[in-house]
């Protein structure tokens, strides 16, 4: 319906990729057995006190900077959010209610008319995660490995106007989290959880409609489905002259619908108070400036740099949206220093190769990536051709041998001796006098013909650059 518009704000919880939890030295891992990564602080045993993980604060400041925010670094304090539930051993959650670490930022996206649009971000704040609940046969099982895992909650203003804009916002946020090494941002592991606040109003109206919150959506595609369903649900109520109730709902991905959870009239009073077991942290401007200088690039700086080095936009966005692939790309490009070539051989050819074997880039060792880098250097130096490079890439993957060894084993060693190549040209030209006479009229065609003859004669082992340069000298005499 063109007469109504949707108003969307979102809240995103992202789990930080720190080595230990937020207030204890317990390691963090998504892959460990249930209830094996816990200690007395995580379980809130009597007499325990929290100690702030420095890395969590640093990552909060990095994200605030990446989102163009004002940081409250001169007074970093924590608060208690009280509620009683199985997943919260203390009976309260340590969060930041009164002094969030970052305020008043934005993410820029491209709207549906292809115009730049800034989506304001109200605040980001640090908090600890709760235990993970699993319900089986009417019984609830708790895994406290997740309890105390550090989170950042990102709260946007209600600036989004469609499911498409919301998806673009989340994709850009995810790239920022990956680029700044703040989170692995894997929704399948629960590292990125999204709540959507949605209302509709007559187009042109200033006041908001009644807001409905959709909790814990587990994929970006489901965010779009939830918004579109909820828009139509609310619109149908309005067209039937029924009121939209303020509710909390969840998205059911088996039916692609939102399902009632509770009325907002039943909203919990969290009774926020200061967390006095954690002293405020005072960071100077100089400290924060020095910290932020360790990440001099913004994500847009990197986009421009890669564009200037020949990568197309679609390739850049693929890299920025895949943290492990981008990490491998950076590592190999340090060896090669040619982003376009690295993208072709690593991100297209090699990824296609490992996908056939149901592997992912995280499975690949740095040693193997180093050998791929050395292979790409040889290709860029025209010491091997494209067909040979593809064969060598497969052999590196299967045997873990270095490219120079494989070149010898496969008989791909090139003829680079100029005297030998000159003698070969004399032989080829002597056998093709008629074509030689056509050079002045059709130089490109003649050069192409002779290069083909050289490759045939040497079984593609003559170095093409050296061969072509010698041919030009002979033909221009």
Curated annotation (Swiss-Prot):
Annotated EC: 6.3.5.-
Gene3D superfamilies the UniProt entry points to: 1.10.10.410
Keywords: ATP-binding, Ligase, Nucleotide-binding, Protein biosynthesis
GO molecular function: asparaginyl-tRNA synthase (glutamine-hydrolyzing) activity; ATP binding; glutaminyl-tRNA synthase (glutamine-hydrolyzing) activity
Reaction it catalyzes: L-glutamyl-tRNA(Gln) + L-glutamine + ATP + H2O = L-glutaminyl-tRNA(Gln) + L-glutamate + ADP + phosphate + H(+); L-aspartyl-tRNA(Asn) + L-glutamine + ATP + H2O = L-asparaginyl-tRNA(Asn) + L-glutamate + ADP + phosphate + 2 H(+)
Function: Allows the formation of correctly charged Asn-tRNA(Asn) or Gln-tRNA(Gln) through the transamidation of misacylated Asp-tRNA(Asn) or Glu-tRNA(Gln) in organisms which lack either or both of asparaginyl-tRNA or glutaminyl-tRNA synthetases. The reaction takes place in the presence of glutamine and ATP through an activated phospho-Asp-tRNA(Asn) or phospho-Glu-tRNA(Gln).
Binding partners and assembly: Heterotrimer of A, B and C subunits.
Record protein name field: Aspartyl/glutamyl-tRNA(Asn/Gln) amidotransferase subunit B
Source organism of the structure: Ureaplasma urealyticum serovar 10 (strain ATCC 33699 / Western)
